[in-house]
Amino acid sequence: MIRIDHVTFSYGEENENAGGVHDINLTVEDGQCVVLCGESGSGKTTITRLINGLIPHYYEGKMNGEVWVNGAKVSEQPLYDTAKTVGSVFQNPRSQFFNVDTTSEITFGCENLGQPEQSIRERLDKTIRDFRLEKLMGRNIFHLSGGEKQKIACAGVSIMEPDVLVMDEPSSNLDASSILDLRAILAFWKSQGKTIIVSEHRLYYLRGLADRFIYITGGKVEKDYSAAEFESLTEQQRAKSVSYTHLRAHET
């Protein structure tokens, strides 16, 4: 379970224009898929950083309140410990790559933790099957398309078997076909009982998958919709808060 308890955060001078958050209270139950939506700068990305520990361990700023993930207080444990529980896929997958070839990139996290070679091989084989990556193995990462890079990033996170997956605007650099692949990955994780947090401005592909849509504005939670409540909104109500209709044509 994820619990954000009265958290306020403002960035330091280097990131002073980034969207902070104000008195956020949020609980996410195990196995839920939750979408954080709202305009750019509303605080969506900041919430993902609170969950994966990049705040307060990487981004400087002033923080009040606490965040717990699976009973552990994020501010009091090393970032590498949080990373064992929370896997992150960033808006630009290239920013999280450590290797040039795809196979080494996927296994990097396991190798970094010193896991046995046989265990890594077994996990790799399973991940290749789960993500249908046979044609992408042994490739130069920088010769891949945006969608292929994201598949590798997701595979590199999934092989670590975290309980929680956090994604920051994962569809922003994808075409329609790659967005369908992204939905399939999210559906696979959900079928495994993973807790999923997605910061997103395109919402059409998440219908029928997300359990909640949380609208963030001005660093605060304005609305917390269940899937049924979100479906009951009119097109005008959806468009007012999120870019729901931006890619509506791709539904057909």
Residue ranges and their predicted role:
Residues T245-T252:
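Conserved small/polar residues in nucleotide/adenosyl-binding loops
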Residues E200-H201:
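H-loop/switch region of ABC-family ATPase nucleotide-binding domains
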Residues Q118-L136:
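Conserved ABC ATPase "signature" region
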Residues E66-D81:
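ABC ATPase NBD Q-loop/coupling interface
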Residues L165-D168:
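Catalytic Walker B motif of ABC-type/P-loop ATPase nucleotide-binding domains
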Residues C154-A155:
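Hydrophobic anchor residue at the start of the ABC signature
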Residues N140-L144, E148:
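Conserved ABC ATPase signature
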